[in-house]
Design a protein with these regions (language model features):
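Active-site-adjacent alpha-helix immediately C-terminal to a catalytic or transition-state-stabilizing loop
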Residues: 16, 135-184
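Short, surface-exposed amphipathic charged segments that create phosphate/polyanion-binding patches used
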Residues: 121-128, 184
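A polyampholytic, Gly/Pro-enriched intrinsically disordered region
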Residues: 126-138
Length: 184
């Protein structure tokens, strides 16, 4: 009996991750969820000292793996027939590119901008309030509300720190219902 239990335990450890994502994808099928997506893979951390919001060449950007990861996110939303009400993105190029490759249409939303660097840290509380008010006004009777943003924003808002391209599903009261990791 112990041998069987051991093999069952070992087998469980090697179940593909997508299997564990099924429950999370099913949560999204009826709409009405708030979906936070950390931007897809962009090597490094933070942004260079000469960072300029209007100039992508001064920012940390998606590489080819990040582009593929973004495209995979979009393909999975289609494959699972996930209804999307609106997609909003941070104004950082890596977030906008993630949104564009995954969903096509999106709107910029400054409340989703990173507050990681000293230059923007002072905006953190204001952005959290603006984002909270936006979600409270959102009519959750339709599709899902999608935010493409940064580690620091998801962490500050949900107290969960996602990997690159990870999808975090919450209800309107911002209780985390599930997460989906998308490989790059």
């Amino acid at each position: 009996m112990r041998v069987i239990n051991f093999f069952l335990l070992i087998s469980f450890l090697f179940i593909p991750h997508s299997f564990s994502n099924e429950t999370s994808w099913n949560l999204l099928k009826d709409g009405g969820k708030v979906v936070f997506i950390r931007h897809a893979y962009a090597p490094g951390g933070g942004d260079p000292d000469n960072f300029d919001l209007e100039d992508c060449s001064t920012q940390r950007n998606l590489n080819q793996q990040g582009v593929r990861q973004s495209q995979t996110i979009g393909q999975l939303f289609i494959e699972y027939s996930i209804p999307v009400d609106s997609v909003y993105s941070s104004q950082w190029c890596r977030c906008r590119d993630t949104a564009r490759y995954a969903f096509g249409d999106f709107k910029n939303f400054s409340a989703l901008n990173s507050t990681f660097s000293g230059k923007y840290q002072k905006n953190h509380s204001k952005q959290m309030l603006e984002l909270s008010e936006f979600i409270n006004r959102w009519d959750d009777s339709g599709g899902n509300l999608v935010f493409v943003t940064h580690y620091v924003i998801v962490g500050g808002f949900l107290d969960y720190y996602p990997n690159s391209g990870e999808i975090v599903i919450a209800d309107k009261s911002l209780s985390i219902l599930g997460t989906i990791k998308v490989d790059f």
